Amino acid sequence: IISSALKNAEDILKKSQISSWRLDAEVLLAEALLKDRSEIIIRDDLKISNKKAFTFNRYIDRRKKFEPVAYILNNKEFFSLDFFVNKNSLIPRTETELMVEKAVKIYKNKNPNVLDIGTGSGCIIISVLRHLPKSRGIGLDISNDAIKVAKFNSERLLKVYNKRIKFMNLSIEKLSNNR
């Protein structure tokens, strides 16, 4: 039953000193059950299959070891888009959305070329290009694994606009030496 699974998970996370124990337990259970968080709170008498309980327990085991929820679920919302994230990219920060919002506002009626250094998941450049449809951009990262994450997000989120963006496995030092 949802209520007992949730209570047990909350106790585990609280004991592990996870500050957002309740929210994390609810989010992880909702994902394991493929339901909205509000539904698991309202319909807490629903039964959980063994398979979904196993998935949920794996999520809780990872979270109690302080693995971020975004890495457990391989997902982080940024600027109203759902980005794939993993250990190869930093988790997009809420404060960074303010920077993207400001850039979109400043360049709304212009077509800037965008350079994203340390692109990671590609959240900044992809979000900017989604809102500036005539702009083009390049995302750089020294990690080839991060570039793979950014390309994956670009293909998913930019779709037909993908020809406007290029990702390169390159450090800023090499870029400045190639002048």
Predicted regions located by residue number:
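Short helix-capping segments at alpha-helix termini
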Residues: I18, L132-K134, R156-N162
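Hydrophobic alpha-helical packing residues
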Residues: L13, V128, S154-L157
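Short, solvent-exposed polar/charged micro-motifs at secondary-structure junctions
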Residues: L34, N50-K51, S80-D82, S176-R179
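S-adenosyl-L-methionine
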Residues: K151-R179
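Short, solvent-exposed loop/helix junctions and linker helices
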Residues: R22, N50-A53, L90-T94, R179
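N-terminal auxiliary segments of SAM/dcSAM-dependent transferases
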Residues: I1-L73
